Amino acid sequence: MTKLIIHLVSDSSVQTAKYAANSALAQFTSVKPKLYHWPMIRNLELLNEVLSKIESKHGIVLYTIADQELRKALTKFCYELKIPCISVIGKIIKEMSVFSCIEIEKEQNYNYKFDKTYFDTLNAIDYAIRHDDGQMLNELSEADIILIGPSRTSKTPTSVFLAYNGLKAANIPYVYNCPSPDFIEKDIDQLVVGLVINPNRLIEIREARLNLLQINDNKSYTDFNIVQKECLEVRKICDQKNWPVIDVSTRSIEETAALIMRIYYNRKNKYNK
């Protein structure tokens, strides 16, 4: 496989550059990437430390830096080394400025903006934690999204990912031969999404979990027939209620959450017409 070094340089958390890099890397199956993360680069002293690392390990540079002086120093350095230096959002900012006829603000303010979006995200994270794994079912009316599925179908991390996008998500496990949650019998306004998975894949995940916890006496948890029935029952319930179902067998948490958000916002836009 072809090795590829990528330096992610940011005056913040490098997440934007990381998402861009991973999205691009998904198009190259024969590449073995090595990502170097350089967050919170906000002055020349810190940048010079990064530049020395880039010089010792040549690779593509992806950056999100607002300060003009730092950007110039970084791009000049990479130009002299003859390595690509790409602004992840520079083109977007420029096009926004041209289209809206609004001049780009030169001054960079590193104080975080504590706006409504920020507090909505905090509230959503708090909600996801308090309503994990079927807890506090009496507060489901506050949820934007409810996830239901067998154990180990990525319900919890998906709920947290949704929360980071400002959506309150509760998740409820479906266990074969156990009473179904009351909300299944009711007509509710919230978006309910069923998560299912290939039974063989689910058994692998559950066996790994049991090994990690050093538990050897839970045969039903990894019994193929029971696992298969749990997935089939979730599908059946969702079909009866006309709830969408997502098969997470080959999907990342980000993919699953993105699909759920698309369903949620399509539904919301439909009702807001």
UniProtKB/Swiss-Prot annotation:
Record keywords, A-Z: Kinase, Nucleotide-binding, Serine/threonine-protein kinase, Transferase
Record carries keyword Kinase: yes
Gene Ontology MF terms in the entry: ADP binding; ATP binding; phosphotransferase activity, phosphate group as acceptor; protein serine/threonine kinase activity
Catalytic activity, reaction form: N(tele)-phospho-L-histidyl/L-threonyl-[pyruvate, phosphate dikinase] + ADP = N(tele)-phospho-L-histidyl/O-phospho-L-threonyl-[pyruvate, phosphate dikinase] + AMP + H(+); N(tele)-phospho-L-histidyl/O-phospho-L-threonyl-[pyruvate, phosphate dikinase] + phosphate + H(+) = N(tele)-phospho-L-histidyl/L-threonyl-[pyruvate, phosphate dikinase] + diphosphate
E.C. number: 2.7.11.32, 2.7.4.27
Leading EC class: transferase
Keyword Repeat: no
Residues bound to ADP: 149-156
Summary of the function given for this chain in its UniProt record: Bifunctional serine/threonine kinase and phosphorylase involved in the regulation of the pyruvate, phosphate dikinase (PPDK) by catalyzing its phosphorylation/dephosphorylation.
Family the UniProt entry places it in: Belongs to the pyruvate, phosphate/water dikinase regulatory protein family. PDRP subfamily.
Protein name: Putative pyruvate, phosphate dikinase regulatory protein
